[in-house]
């Protein structure tokens, strides 16, 4: 009799455990429906989240333009976040190298992080060479076409080389740096960017002005 009682007690406890698991699952997953919406966050910030994806050769002026835009947005009381090689390669992508597979994973992670910022209502700028259409399309698919604006910093190769204080282009031409974009690795120029900026002829202030206009922000 004791063994039968123990058996049925075990069954009852197991049933109770399974029911509690079901309740926990029902309580866990719907939490996303109760979180603040993107619209709530954008309303709080008084701005709309958007992705500005800067692409171009090394030395084209991606980071320089991005920083100038960030300062202008900050001056206007708008929240902006820049993602570039310095803060990404030293952090969440520190374990990645420069193989084709790692380059793709690098862009994928950047896009996923960018999407989180955009969904929070933050004006997000990614400044990466991202040399192929495939990589930029990967980022656009993750972030969403509506929020993704491709900005081509189209400064010519000769000017990028002239600006290169680190001598990376010279090393690449001597064969000391392998797979260097623009020299020993190709760069696929965007065919239909939202905006194209050649910093060799367009002053920095004018670049910022054009970006503000693209964002629908009054000069």
Identify the residue ranges that each predicted region occupies:
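Conserved substrate/cofactor phosphate-moiety recognition/catalytic segment
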Residues: 67-112
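The conserved Walker
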Residues: 58
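Extreme N-terminal, non-catalytic leader segments
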Residues: 17, 21-51
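Hydrophobic anchor at the beta1->P-loop junction of P-loop NTPases
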Residues: 54
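Conserved lysine of the Walker
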Residues: 62
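Small-molecule kinase domains that catalyze NTP-dependent phosphoryl transfer to phosphate-bearing small molecules
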Residues: 154-210, 217-218
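ATP-dependent NMP and nucleoside kinases share a basic, alpha-helical "lid"
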Residues: 91-98, 114-172, 179
């Amino acid at each position: 009799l004791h063994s039968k009682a123990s058996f049925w007690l075990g069954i009852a406890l197991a049933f109770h455990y399974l029911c509690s698991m079901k309740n926990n699952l029902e309580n866990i997953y719907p939490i996303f429906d109760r979180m603040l919406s993107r619209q709530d966050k954008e309303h709080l910030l008084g701005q709309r989240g958007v992705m500005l994806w800067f692409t171009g050769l090394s030395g084209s002026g991606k980071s320089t333009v991005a920083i100038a835009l960030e300062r202008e947005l900050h001056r206007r009381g708008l929240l902006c976040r820049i993602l570039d090689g310095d803060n990404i390669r030293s952090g969440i992508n520190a374990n990645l190298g420069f193989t084709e597979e790692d380059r793709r994973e690098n862009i994928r992670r950047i896009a996923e992080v960018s999407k989180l910022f955009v969904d929070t209502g933050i004006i997000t700028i990614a400044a990466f060479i991202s040399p192929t259409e495939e990589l930029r399309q990967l980022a656009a698919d993750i972030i969403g076409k509506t929020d993704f604006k491709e900005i081509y910093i189209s400064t010519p190769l000769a000017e990028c080389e002239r600006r290169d204080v680190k001598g990376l282009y010279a090393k690449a031409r001597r064969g000391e740096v392998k797979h260097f974009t623009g020299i020993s690795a190709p760069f696929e120029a965007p065919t239909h960017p939202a905006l194209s900026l050649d910093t060799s002829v367009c002053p920095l202030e004018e670049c910022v002005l054009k970006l503000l206009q693209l964002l629908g922000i009054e000069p």
